[in-house]
Design a protein with these regions (language model features):
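C-terminal single-pass membrane-anchor helix
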Residues: 234-281
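Solvent-exposed, non-transmembrane regions of membrane-associated and secreted proteins
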Residues: 3-244
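Intrinsic low-complexity, intrinsically disordered segments enriched in polar/basic residues
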Residues: 2-3, 277
Length: 281
């Protein structure tokens, strides 16, 4: 009986340890599933729009960006722009588009604002900056967390180098940006996020150093021509990536359950020495 109890305790400890080890991977997988479906649903809703709808949405976004460019303090007073939340909110869920960073395997929906609820699961657009629809004198800022145990998000953003590219898809428009500047600043140093006259920039922002988060990593991209192969990509909700580290434990789980059953219920033979002792009595 004591051996059975010890075996059960050891097995429970093993499974608890395995659960702790797998939590980040499983949580990230669930987040990727949510993100991919959100992007796929967005793309499906966008496909239902007419050319007139596209024109109206982009004209509203361009008008908003003109207001941002005309106000040098827009970043500090985003409340001056009450139309922000409704502009480009095609689905009514707050998604304005999505970002794809092929080098680090990232595809995230972009939501209005950078509330903690948004940044826990996706990328957020920084209020007071241009909407990411491109054009001269625009500078959009897209932010996401890194180092969360539940999601990768921008965890590997520091792997990007000058010359790498990323894309932003809004409605039926896919824009490509080439990284031209990488910097680390204090949270209060925001001048580099302002609009530069005539330039078309998007800056990706996250916390740094990893796990300490006292500064901000800024990866700026300048607009370049989008290759034809990227202009008509459609995302499907089945495009889910399963990490190898998750696959192995899932395959091993049935074997572990069989082992547990055998340890608990397999008949045990007494040793011959004990049998002889009992016979003499």
């Amino acid at each position: 009986m004591k051996k059975n109890k010890s075996t059960i305790i050891l097995i429970l400890v093993f499974f608890v340890g395995l659960s702790v080890m797998l939590y980040p991977t499983i949580s990230d997988y669930v987040n990727q599933l949510h993100q991919t479906r959100a992007v796929a649903n967005y793309a499906a809703d966008v496909d239902k729009l007419s050319d007139a709808d596209y024109t109206a949405y982009f004209e509203a976004a361009d008008a908003f960006n003109a207001q941002i460019a005309a106000d040098p303090d827009a970043l500090y007073f985003p409340d001056r722009f009450p139309s922000y939340e409704s502009t480009l909110d095609v689905t009514g869920t707050g998604i304005m588009g999505y970002i794809t960073i092929e080098k680090i395997g990232v595809e995230l929906p972009i939501y209005h604002g950078t509330s903690d609820a948004v940044l826990q699961v996706a990328a957020g657009h920084l209020e007071g900056t241009s909407l990411p629809v491109g054009g001269a004198s625009t500078h959009a800022v897209i932010s996401a967390h890194r180092g969360l145990p539940s999601a990768k998000l921008f965890t590997n953003l520091d792997q990007l180098e000058v010359g790498d590219t990323f894309t932003i898809t809004v409605l039926d428009r896919t824009l490509t940006y080439e990284v031209d500047n990488i910097s680390i600043v204090l949270p209060t140093e925001t001048d580099s996020l302002k609009v530069s006259e005539g330039k078309d920039y998007i800056t990706l922002m996250t916390c740094t150093p990893y796990g300490i988060n006292t500064h901000r990593l800024l990866v700026r991209g300048r607009r370049i021509t989008t290759p034809d192969k990227l202009k008509h990509i459609r995302v499907t909700s089945d495009a889910i990536k399963i990490e190898p580290i998750l696959t192995a434990p899932i395959m091993a789980l049935p074997l572990l359950l069989v082992l547990l059953f055998w340890l608990l219920f397999a008949p045990r033979k007494r040793s011959s020495a004990k049998d002889k002792t009992h016979k003499t009595h």
